[in-house]
Swiss-Prot record:
Lineage: Viruses, Varidnaviria, Bamfordvirae, Nucleocytoviricota, Pokkesviricetes
Function: Plays a role in the inhibition of host innate immune system by acting as a negatively regulator of type I interferon production. Mechanistically, interacts with and prevents host IRF3 nuclear localization to inhibit its transcriptional activity.
UniProt-recorded name of the protein: Uncharacterized protein E301R
GO BP, sorted A to Z: symbiont-mediated suppression of host cytoplasmic pattern recognition receptor signaling pathway via inhibition of IRF3 activity
UniProt keyword list: Host-virus interaction, Inhibition of host innate immune response by virus, Inhibition of host IRF3 by virus, Inhibition of host RLR pathway by virus, Late protein, Viral immunoevasion
InterPro entries, per database record: DNA_clamp_sf
Amino acid sequence: MSEDIRRGPGRPPKKRVVPNFERKGILEKPVRPQSRLEFSYDNPLIFKNLFIYFKNLKSKNILVRCTPTEITFFSRDQSQASFVIATIDGKNVNHYYASDVFWLGINRELVEKMFNSIDRSFLKITIVHRYDKPETLYFIFTDFDIDKECTYQITVSEPELDMDLIEMEKSISEERLKNYPLRWEFTSKQLKKTFSDLSNYTELVTIEKLGGDTPLHLYFQKFNSISYHEMYKSSNKINLTSTIPKSQVFQINVKIAHIKSLASAMVTDKIRILCEENGNLIFQSEMDALMLNTITMNNMI
């Protein structure tokens, strides 16, 4: 601030001291002896954004799978055409412990209300599931500025597993992801604008790319009516990569309504899009330790 400019009346802003949290990752033993699950993480707003995404998609029930190495959230959108799989690797958080592999069922609306009350004053979230209270999941939020701890006890159930949803996890296995023939990145703003504009004219759009160093091409054409072409000529500007041989053409038809609803629901600035030969799309985004995957089944059209 210039010496000629004086601060107005009032108390100067207090500089917040943020604790230095060590990320120890996976523990061999829990901190609390009765814990079947312990999850401690210094970024509670990631969970708030995740449940905003579930709300935007109008998901209902959420399956939670806990394993000794990671915690994963599974759900569907309202249309049943998109499958959400969100994973946090235990090695990337402050501490994580799960005794074995087990599943919990939680109601999205119930948990969403809890996260709506969480703001930036809370610097840590701890999730605990205990052997002696299997029907309860504890969410503990800590505000270190005033040494406040808020604990919510949410009723959970042993869920009926949605095997079709769980099976979709194979689509995002490390080996499978290497073999997708086409991928690129959009900002959430670009994704929303492209599919919102297209929805004014057509229900289907074609995604096309020739083999070699050629542009990404999105288009539609209505006989004796209107056509539209959207070309991305600089592959580096959208991180476009492909494994399409030079002599071949990759082409799929996508139902715009599916993508438009996803684009409106997104809670991250950047989205990676991967295409399968069968027409399915995967939308990937990252929020700190969270990897968010949404698989859209365009072969259902």
